[in-house]
Curated annotation (Swiss-Prot):
This is Subtilisin-like protease SBT4.3. CDD domains: PA_subtilisin_like (cd02120), Peptidases_S8_3 (cd04852). One of its GO terms (biological process) is proteolysis. Pfam families: fn3_6, Inhibitor_I9, Peptidase_S8. It comes from Arabidopsis thaliana. Residues 350-436 form the PA domain. The gene is SBT4.3. Keywords: Autocatalytic cleavage, Glycoprotein, Hydrolase, Protease, Secreted, Serine protease, Signal, Zymogen.
């Protein structure tokens, strides 16, 4: 993305600061706060006027108009304003205010991926109904001219569409890309200058485009999960993604009439769901029948790192496919080592001198020089040479110094190949150590880095190390992430003005139409695409029914490659075709979530304002008893446990059907009983309840045990993971 020059940036900041201070000289230093006020009143009401009057009472008439940043007025009630901490606390004490929290900034977290999850081009589709489904993508914008968003063969937008094309300068929508908006006052367009939003939008709902590739790698037909669906793009990310803009995008997307929201943005840890923009936005989306898919985050493999943990949204971990990118390093002595990267460059059989970072630095300590830290690589000493760096981020410094190539030790992301701007490879510890030994002993040491090739990864699927893990420390007794989806080395549409190796080097000037990216950001739109696919078959299904269908039909993964098991992959890897016909679903209504929030400590007044419903909190639902498709409980590591889960399923399969329960796999540490063990249905939409009781001896501190309940009628298999854990923050 193009950046403001430093002088202009400072001028803009100076202007903002001057404006705020001059508006009210006695005010303390201020920040942007979000004042969330719940649902919009049903009476005749002007949100901006009301918001301004609140500020006028707080700071006076003259200052108020300068402090108001944005009003949320289409789908829920609230505003953003420049406030001091003391002023924010005064607003928090107002009866009509649910929460006040600072607007933070957050990070943005295919030819083969859909085939790998059993969702080929010939999968059963309802193309006419699919074209009525609208996927809203909250991200870094979109490149409207991409073939993935061409509207050939599309009719006019669905009648339910209430949005518009406000993409800015030189930006045109069409019958495929039916809407666009942007939310930063320094921007002039919804056009994607980072590539991220274009990539995610095309993964969810892009057209089928033949012969797509990244310089010949991953060649094939690139397509989204629902190629016939429509797309609306909401640009909230401009290097970073601010809460104030994220909420504005939700406000618009809900009112515009989207059916599914994909948001590949991982919010920082929050202790209160009503202080989190994605949680608030997705709650109001759920109330309007819209399902939100959100990325689990890229802070793995640490326990408890999972983000976007609201129970009303579907939280997506990343998994790999059976396609892996590797490259080989051939040393002067003929020894070949295997590394990983997406390296499209060819050295044509020529071996170049290879030097260690410590030997080509004049200004740094030995440790920093070995890492190839910023400013440590001497350009005069690396010209025409390959540099060996102890740190993954040495890529950029070697490139900027003018080296012919780089080899790095990859302990940061050992299972993820990233696009590199010149010949490069990342090696595991043992192979890297052998190169260091070779440099010390050979005279002269030489090497060649070969172009990346594709191989079959027979251990897939597995969750890569970067994908955030559970358990959730925000809401105990709720399994997060919910599911996993392909998010490793995914090819999809890209912005031609963005650097394809921006993660490592924004100076990479290559222009591409399709690129390879990794992250839970890439996994999230896969699930949004599946949700849209299920919606095309069942347009009247609730968000919880669609979510249940995706979760209970997911495939459990290889335990040897995924030692964290459900805390890594949730219910398992998505199976789109099965999700369209799940047999049974677990449904959760708004009032059920509110009862759960009561049990989590929220009071009746707060929840009444939030939902617009009359909430008394006389009835509370423990999180473990929320009618969720998984069953999870925290247990003390000091005592044996005995826990009961109550669940209700709705028949959406055959009218006359009988389901029998089984426990898979049987675990000696976990005793499970199900009552009743048989459910008989006589008609569609009939509901049946059952109780699952688990017991066991005390778990070791920081451990867990898991199994699953599977209901089967011979045609459908409805699987619900069960997890007991003693992991604490």
């Amino acid at each position: 993305m193009a950046k403001l020059s430093t002088p202009l940036y400072l001028i803009c900041l100076a202007f903002i600061f001057t404006r705020d201070v001059s508006a009210n000289d006695y005010r303390q230093a201020s920040s942007v706060y979000i004042v969330y006020m719940g649902t919009l009143p049903e009476i005749k009401y002007s949100p901006p006027s009301h918001h301004l009057s609140i500020l006028q009472k707080l700071v006076g008439t003259i200052a108020a108009s300068h402090l108001l940043v944005r009003s949320y007025k289409r789908s829920f009630n609230g505003f953003a304003a420049n406030l001091s901490q003391a002023e924010s606390q005064k607003l928090q004490n107002m009866k009509e205010v649910v929460s006040v929290f600072p607007s933070k900034s957050h990070e943005l977290t295919t030819t083969r991926s859909w085939d790998f999850v059993g969702f080929g081009e010939k999968a059963r589709r309802e193309s006419v109904k699919e074209s009525d489904v609208i996927v809203g993508v909250i991200d870094s914008g979109i490149w409207p001219e991409s073939e993935s968003f061409d509207d050939e063969g599309f009719g006019p937008p669905p009648k339910k569409w209430k949005g518009s094309c406000k993409g800015g300068l030189k930006f045109a929508c069409n019958n495929k890309l039916i809407g666009a908006r942007f939310y930063n006052k320094f921007a002039d367009s919804a056009r994607d200058e980072e590539g991220h939003g274009t990539h995610t939008a095309s993964t969810a709902a892009g057209n089928a485009v033949q012969a797509a590739s990244f310089y010949g790698l991953a060649q094939g037909t690139a397509r989204g999960g629902v190629p016939s669906a429509r797309i609306a793009a909401y640009k909230v990310c401009f290097n970073r993604c601010n809460d104030v803009d994220i909420l504005a995008a939700f406000d618009d997307a809900i009112a515009d009439g989207v059916d599914v929201i994909s948001i590949s943005i991982s919010a920082d840890y929050v202790s209160n769901l009503l202080n989190a923009s994605v949680a608030i936005g997705s709650f109001h989306a759920m109330m309007r029948g819209i399902i939100t898919a959100g990325s689990a985050g890229n802070n793995g493999p640490d326990q408890g790192s999972v983000a976007n943990v609201s129970p009303w949204m579907i939280t997506v971990a990343a998994s790999g496919t059976d396609r892996q990118f590797i490259d080989r390093v051939v040393l002067g002595n003929g020894k070949a080592l295997t590394g990983i990267s997406v390296n499209t460059f060819n050295l044509n059989g020529t071996k170049f001198p290879i030097v260690y970072g410590q030997n080509v630095s004049r200004n740094c300590s030995q440790a920093q020089a070995g890492y190839c830290s910023s400013g440590c690589v001497d350009s005069e000493l690396v010209k025409g040479k390959i540099v060996l760096c102890d740190d993954f981020l040495g890529y950029r410094e070697a490139y900027l110094a003018g080296a012919i190539g780089v080899i790095v030790q990859n302990t940061l992301l050992p299972d993820s190949a990233f696009v590199v701007p010149f010949p490069a490879s990342s090696l595991g510890f043992e192979d890297y150590k052998s190169i260091k030994s070779y440099i010390e002993s050979a005279e002269p040491p030489q090497a060649e880095i070969l172009r990346t090739e594709e191989i079959v990864d027979r251990e897939a699927p597995y969750v890569p190390s970067f994908s955030s893990r559970g358990p959730s420390f925000v809401i105990q007794n709720l399994l997060k992430p919910d599911v996993s989806a392909p998010g490793l080395e995914i090819l999809a549409a890209f912005s031609p003005v963005a650097s394809p190796s921006s993660f490592l080097n924004p100076e990479d000037k290559r222009s591409v139409r399709y690129s390879v990216m990794s992250g839970t950001s890439m996994a999230c739109p896969h699930v949004a695409g599946v949700a849209a696919y299920v919606k095309s078959f069942h347009p009247d299904w609730s968000p919880s029914a669609i979510k249940s269908a995706i979760m209970t039909t997911a495939t459990p993964m290889n335990l040897k490659k995924n030692p964290e098991q459900e805390f890594a992959y949730g219910s398992g890897q998505i199976n789109p075709t099965k999700a369209s016909d799940p047999g049974l679903v677990y449904e959760v209504e708004t009032e059920d979530y509110l009862k759960m929030l009561c049990a989590e400590g929220f009071d009746s007044t707060t929840l009444t304002t939030t939902s617009g419903q009359n909430v008394t909190c006389s009835e509370r639902t423990e999180v473990k008893d929320l009618n969720y498709p998984t069953m999870t409980t925290f247990v003390s590591s000091l005592d044996p446990f005995n826990v009961t889960f109550k669940r209700t399923v709705t028949n959406v399969g055959f009218p006359n059907s009988t389901y029998k329960a089984s426990v898979v796999p049987l675990q000696p540490e976990l005793q499970i009983s199900i009552e009743p063990e048989i459910l008989r249905f006589g008609f569609l939409e009939e509901k049946k309840s059952f109780v699952v009781t688990i017991s066991g001896k005390e778990l070791k501190d920081g451990s867990f045990v898991s199994s699953s309940v599977v209901w089967s009628d011979g045609s459908h298999s409805v699987r619900s993971p069960i997890v007991a854990y003693s992991i604490q923050p």
